[in-house]
C-alpha cells in the first residue's frame, strides 16, 4: 500500500492498484477521486475485520496484500464463510467512505445529502413533534451505496453461482441499517482517537 502522504494522478492511481477487473479500471478512469476514496473504504473494512476477528484463529491478516485491494487476496476468491462477511463489510466500507467524502466536499461527483435535518428539541431536551431544524451537511448515503454497487458488483460475472453469492453479500453489506450502524460505530471510535 502507498504512503498516505503521496497523492497520485488519476491515471496512475488506476494503473497501480492490483486486482482490478477491466470494468473496474473503466470505473476508475471515469471517477478516479471516488475510486481512491473507495479504496479507503476497503482498507477500513480490513481494519474492522481485524477488530471483529482479533481473538480468532483467522484474524484477517491474509487480507494484507501488497496492493491496497483486499479483493486481490486469495481468501476473497473462494466461498468461505469469512469471505462472505468480508464481501458485506467491504461493500459497507466503500459506501461509508464515499458517503462521508461527499459530506466533507472531497468529491467532485457528489455533494451533501439534502436530508441533513434533525428533530428540534424543547428546553428540557424533549423532541418537538413535527419540528425540524437544519443540522448541516449529512452523509450522502444514497450516493455511497450506488457507487459501492457500481464499483464492487461490476467485478462479478452474471452466470456464475459464486458471483451471485458475492453480489448477495455485497447487498447485505450495503443495506442501509448495516451502513448506518457502521457510520455510528466508526464515528464513536473517532472521538477517542
Name what the model sees in each region.
Residues 1-193:
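Long, position-biased, composition-driven segments near the start of the mature protein
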Amino acid at each position: 500500500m502507498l504512503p498516505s502522504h503521496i497523492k497520485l494522478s488519476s491515471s496512475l492511481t488506476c494503473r497501480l492498484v492490483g486486482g482490478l477487473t477491466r470494468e473496474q479500471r473503466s470505473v476508475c478512469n471515469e471517477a478516479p477521486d471516488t475510486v481512491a476514496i473507495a479504496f479507503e473504504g476497503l482498507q477500513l473494512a480490513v481494519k474492522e475485520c481485524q477488530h471483529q476477528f482479533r481473538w480468532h484463529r483467522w484474524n484477517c491478516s491474509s487480507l494484507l496484500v501488497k496492493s491496497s485491494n483486499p479483493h486481490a487476496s486469495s481468501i476473497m476468491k473462494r466461498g468461505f464463510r469469512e469471505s462472505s462477511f468480508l464481501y458485506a463489510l467491504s461493500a459497507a466500507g466503500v459506501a461509508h467512505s464515499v458517503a462521508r467524502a461527499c459530506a466533507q466536499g472531497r468529491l467532485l461527483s457528489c455533494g451533501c445529502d439534502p436530508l441533513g435535518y434533525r428533530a428540534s428539541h424543547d428546553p428540557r431536551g424533549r423532541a418537538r413533534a413535527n419540528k425540524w431544524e437544519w443540522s448541516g451537511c449529512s452523509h450522502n448515503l444514497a450516493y455511497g451505496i450506488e457507487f459501492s454497487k457500481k464499483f464492487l458488483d461490476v467485478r462479478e460475472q452474471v452466470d456464475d453461482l459464486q458471483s451471485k453469492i458475492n453480489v448477495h453479500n455485497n447487498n447485505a453489506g450495503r443495506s442501509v441499517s448495516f451502513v448506518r450502524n457502521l457510520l455510528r460505530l466508526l464515528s464513536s471510535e473517532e472521538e477517542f482517537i
